[in-house]
């Protein structure tokens, strides 16, 4: 089992032991696993070591922002074209709100955006996420890109 985690989380998850590959995955770390590459990018969160991840596989780049606020400094870490971005929209707990998330997704140049972190601590309707090519996830339904 592969476990990628920034330093503070890495220190904790290693305590679980087991036959796992625990990789310290701090900002701007690149890690390849077979034909898949993982690249960590800055996230703006209360946890200063928080990161997002760009996963590259089968010729596509998927950017999972993780918990983050909109911060222009993040864009300096995005060093490849983004096919799909997964972005929080709930505006709670240092996550972007729906408006900022749409602006952020557009600025990355992503072809498709998937709003996440809605319906947790809020009553946000993800259909209000202003992005031309968006995919609204449904519970227990696979998304194919």
Residue ranges of predicted features:
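Active-site HxH/HxHxD metal-binding segment of metal-dependent hydrolases
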Residues: 1-31
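Binuclear metal-ion centers of metallo-dependent hydrolases, dominated by the metallo-beta-lactamase
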Residues: 17, 23-28, 76, 100-145
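Active-site-proximal segments of metal-dependent phosphoesterases and phosphodiesterases across multiple
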Residues: 47, 84-106
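Loop/helix-junction capping segments adjacent to catalytic residues or to phosphate/diphosphate-binding pockets
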Residues: 72, 94-96, 121-123
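Active-site metal-binding motif and surrounding structural segment of the metallo-beta-lactamase
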Residues: 1-5, 12, 80-86, 109
């Amino acid at each position: 089992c592969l476990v990628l985690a920034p330093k503070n989380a890495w220190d904790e998850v290693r305590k679980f032991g087991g036959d796992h590959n625990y990789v310290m995955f701090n900002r701007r770390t690149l890690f390849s696993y077979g034909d898949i590459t993982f690249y960590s990018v800055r996230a703006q969160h209360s946890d200063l070591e928080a990161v997002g991840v760009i996963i590259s596989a089968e010729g596509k780049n998927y950017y999972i922002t993780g918990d983050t606020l909109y911060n222009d400094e993040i864009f300096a870490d995005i060093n490849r074209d983004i096919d799909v971005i997964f972005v929080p929209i709930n505006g709670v707990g240092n996550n972007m709100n729906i408006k900022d998330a749409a602006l952020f997704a557009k600025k990355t140049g992503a072809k498709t955006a998937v709003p996440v972190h809605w319906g947790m601590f809020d009553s946000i309707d993800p259909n209000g996420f202003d992005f031309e090519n968006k995919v609204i996830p449904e519970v227990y339904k696979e998304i194919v890109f």
